[in-house]
Amino acid sequence: MSNWTPAADQKNQGTLEFEISRAQVEEGLEKAFQRNKNQVSIPGFRKGKVTKALFFSKFGEEALYQEAMDIVLPAAYEAAVEEAGITPVGRPNIEPVSMNKGEAWTLKAEVTTAPAIKLGEYLNLEVAAEDTAVSDADVDAEIKRLQDGQAELVLQEESVKAEDGDTVVIDFDGSVDGDHFDGGQANDFSLALGSGQFIPGFEEQLVGHTAGEDVEVKVTFPEDYQAADLAGKEALFEVKIHELKRKELPELDDEFAKDVDEEVETLAELKEKTAKKLADDKEAAAKSAFEDAVITKAVDNASVDGDAIPDAMIEEDVHRQVDQYLGQLQQQGISREMFFQISGQTEEDLHKQFEEGAATRVKTNLVLEAIVKAEGIEPSAEQVTEEINNLATQYNMDAEQVRSSLSDSLLKHDIAMREVIKKITDSAKAK
């Protein structure tokens, strides 16, 4: 039994009072007892052999209330939510109302609910489509990029003056007001002029100089420089240029083509293959941009009850984005601690970074879910099985592992979201 009472003074807030039946309580107490009986020592009984009745007479059933609650609460809360017909977001604040011995338990939850969505037009929308044509200039630019990738850095004579795009091998020693600072010194450092690798003004002052020269470089650290003790300060770098290297590009001929792509024999074949790849890439990018534009227009056409996304939904989205981001880094071998050490960011910084756009992400999800409901999209059991098999193949896992780690409701949600995006995109027209 559950009772939902909306808050009188706050939208999307309310109190859900619900009951955990005595049978559920007994089930939770039994499971909690089985987990703990091996830890209990009572004279006259071997460990693990104490009866539940004796345990309760000595310690009271209240000793297991918290663990029993942890066991039965999730299912009881989910059932109460379903009965009340609400859609909670974020973590509810749940407190006991009564937990009397031998009786059912009554609890209340302070709940934030998802706001109602009023849909606007979402089918047959008109949005701009990107041009997918590939010009000769596009192909030439890509061939030039491939040519640059095959370039060799060739050591120049001492009489040759450095130009933008050259690479210099330097020693440098930086100081502020005569004091040297951490990170301001290096030997045999390779610097590509014009790369923007150093603070503004540094690389430009090496242009026109030759190998063997000593150069004084004067710069001002940016006001927002990451090292606060250097931000906005003038610095002097004493630079020694050891070597000057310049790119030498390979000839654009059949040999170059074969070096770049072993599947072609001539430069003409390479250009033809490049044109096809550029066309495929443009087509994919245009399709993605068109889909994004359709979703954005459908979301803009919809309105949120109260015109505001609840803070709990924003916080939940940010936490999810942060966890996903750090999880992806973890898969690449970069731990949470390592990331914060390398980046110089704090967890709070990362949360602020993901706060930008959170309201849009949440509204987009709410609108798409509302369209799913309006269109009666309900993925079948066969689609869920297919999704599990696809995920198992993608992540090289057993299908049963995937099934046990992901709920049917989550899988159905993902399938439905893809279906609704396809539906509104397929109905849209390019203008």
Swiss-Prot record:
This enzyme's EC code(s): 5.2.1.8
Record InterPro entries: PPIase_dom_sf (IPR046357), PPIase_FKBP_dom (IPR001179), Trig_fac (IPR005215), Trigger_fac_C (IPR008880), Trigger_fac_C_sf (IPR037041), Trigger_fac_ribosome-bd_bac (IPR008881), Trigger_fac_ribosome-bd_sf (IPR036611), Trigger_fact/SurA_dom_sf (IPR027304)
Cellular localization per UniProt: Cytoplasm
Keywords: Cell cycle, Cell division, Chaperone, Cytoplasm, Isomerase, Rotamase
Catalytic activity: [protein]-peptidylproline (omega=180) = [protein]-peptidylproline (omega=0)
GO MF term set: peptidyl-prolyl cis-trans isomerase activity; protein folding chaperone; ribosome binding
Any GO CC annotation of this UniProt entry: cytoplasm
Top-level taxon of origin: Bacteria
GO biological process entries: 'de novo' cotranslational protein folding; cell division; chaperone-mediated protein folding; protein transport; protein unfolding
Domain PPIase FKBP-type, first and last residues per copy: 165-250
Family as reported in the entry's similarity comment: Belongs to the FKBP-type PPIase family. Tig subfamily.
Function recorded in the entry: Involved in protein export. Acts as a chaperone by maintaining the newly synthesized protein in an open conformation. Functions as a peptidyl-prolyl cis-trans isomerase.
Recorded domain comment: Consists of 3 domains; the N-terminus binds the ribosome, the middle domain has PPIase activity, while the C-terminus has intrinsic chaperone activity on its own.
Name the UniProt record assigns to this protein: Trigger factor
Organism of provenance: Leuconostoc citreum (strain KM20)
